[in-house]
Regions:
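Active-site-proximal alpha-helix that buttresses catalytic centers in soluble enzyme cores
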Residues: 1-215
Length: 215
């Protein structure tokens, strides 16, 4: 088993070389993004393939797909939430990393479903395996059901937008909206990540907290 990172160390090339030197020929690659997105899952797959080819490693690569609805992932997510929720919490916000709407359209293999059919994310289609928004909605529903939450006790939003045309609702707006509705004890979970990072620790835990408290 080797760990590799896109923009840090150990690099993908270094980790693939380590596996090759160990005599491995067939490699299972697990992009640690629970939900499929062009900017994360797809670009990671393409980069691993490129390095394998350019470096002449000749490794047989198999990529493990999105795991947004796997029982183990949902249970782990629920455990994290239960272990960290405030006592007498009023509300749970599922805040996901945002992506441009155009990415949803580009990854739709049917070219006729995403953002073109009413309530597209609620309908089963050939686009779902590649639709980030539909997948995060399903993750949230599965988790909320397992936690026994009523529909008025949780919501979904998207953080880190850059410019117009990104999927909504936006987290910063939702934080203000919830505060204005009288929510006082809010819990926020970021299921798009399997580990904490600058986005969860600073943007959400610091900036998001400040936005909510000042609303």
């Amino acid at each position: 088993v080797e760990v590799a990172m896109r923009y840090q160390f150990p690099s993908i090339k270094e980790s693939l070389l380590n596996l090759k030197n160990k005599g491995c020929e067939e490699i299972f690659v697990v992009p640690l993004y629970p939900h499929y997105a062009m900017s994360t899952t797809l670009t990671t797959e393409n980069e691993v393939k490129r390095i394998n080819e350019d470096s002449n490693f000749r490794l047989d690569l198999t990529f493990i797909g999105a795991f947004y609805k796997e029982d183990q992932y949902i249970q782990s997510l629920c455990n994290v939430i239960k272990n960290n929720r405030q006592e007498e919490s009023d509300f749970l916000l599922f805040s996901y990393h945002g992506i441009p709407n155009r990415h949803l359209v580009k990854t739709d293999p049917t070219k006729s479903h995403c953002l073109k059919v009413k309530n597209c994310c609620d309908l089963d289609s050939d686009a779902r395996p590649y639709c980030y928004k539909a997948q995060v909605i399903e993750t949230s529903n599965l988790c909320a059901n397992k936690l026994g939450l009523k529909r008025n006790e949780w919501s979904i939003s998207f953080q880190s937008r850059i410019g117009p045309g990104w999927i909504e609702p936006f987290t910063d707006k939702e934080l203000v909206n919830l505060a204005e509705k009288g929510i006082e004890r809010l819990d926020v979970v970021c299921p798009a990540f399997v580990t904490d990072n600058l986005e969860t620790l600073e943007e959400m835990n610091m900036q998001g907290r400040e936005t909510f408290l000042e609303a």
